[in-house]
């Protein structure tokens, strides 16, 4: 007699298997990370390890023009508090935030890693001993060269060793340059693979545009003598492209380099304010320089354009100064140049610092929130 029970059991087993397969097809398991996702995650870890391996004072005192919307690996100076009521951030910051908002989480992580990596390259490896090319197509090189030459002869500080270097996202495509960068703090055995991975990610994530996406280098910074790479000013291609897009191309290079060199003036005199005057002071010094007869001697219309550029990088976080405060600081500096009795006299840098520190309280609203003031000071360390 046939074993009907066994046949029935096998039929049920077959049916169960079919049902299980159908269920598996209907509710797929979580997809494994793609190769690109794995690459980006590994690169992010490599760059994090690189930053963690840097000397303790490598990034100390480095002043960035803006706080990038990309949450870059490394220290950030924005105060940990909400925005100032009634304040609207400057147009350049608004544009940068709009660019960042378009990124996917994967793209954001890739930008985070590569932006941090590119800053370390331009700070710790790049040198003005090799020809520097400013602008995505080199279009700003003559203006940048003229500006740094004028600044070195304008302010009475040691200037021969202040480098002006180009910050270019396309440098990320050079494995040799990235190997030099990773060598600053990554374990030697990991350097070669990390450098190769950086260039691979640069080209396998289309949003990066091979290093030409402005967010990668939408900034400038000034570094003091004791930091990684020594005294230097870095000027980002992405920043120059964005300033051009916003209509400030006529004054972009001179204003930004003048501002960043203003930080060198502060560094030279050990002036390290723990408030917004740390950025507004260089606005004032830069305004004085571009309006002065021995600087660029720009007319009133061009001076006004400079103050609007100052305003475009104003923020609303008790960090770098609001748009109105940045504009006022730049205008104050310009007025010092145009109203002095002898138009050819250059005020000593120490005197300019002292004069601005006396003016600074007039540019700020009354300090009604003492806890907030304390928080700003704490954030600046």
Question: Which role does the model predict for each range below?
Answer:
Residues 1-32:
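Secretory targeting and sorting signals
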Residues 35-208:
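A metal-dependent hydrolase signature that marks the N-terminal structural subdomain at the beginning
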Residues 36, 291-381:
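Long, well-structured alpha-helical subdomains associated
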Residues 140-151, 249-253, 257, 261, ...:
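Stable alpha-helical elements in mature extracytoplasmic
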Residues 224-229:
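Extracellular/periplasmic catalytic domains that process cell-envelope and extracellular macromolecules
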Residues 238-255, 271-276:
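Short pre-active-site segment immediately N-terminal to the catalytic Zn-binding motif
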Residues 260-276, 289-295:
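Catalytic Zn2+-binding segment of zinc metalloproteases
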Residues 270-283, 318-321, 325:
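Active-site metal-coordination segments of metallo-dependent hydrolases
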